[in-house]
Amino acid sequence: MIKTVVSTYGEFIGEVDEGADVVVIKKPKMVIQSEKGFGFAKGVCVTSVSEPEEVTIQKANVVMVVDTNPEVLKAYEE
């Protein structure tokens, strides 16, 4: 299921799989904000490959996992 993950590193959208100690996000997109609204970064950090297959975040660094706004979900799927 596609979810929004807010971590100490930033906000991500993707297919979430929660383990005991980690959250794995498949097809992750990092959310970025500008004066014109929101968008998606090309990678998940400055030096990552563009559009990585997945990212693993330690649960200690996850602030929350929530349902994604339908409009944002539509933009993610495009």
Task: Locate the predicted segments by residue.
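Conserved RNA-binding domains used in RNP assembly and mRNA/RNA metabolism
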Residues: 1-78
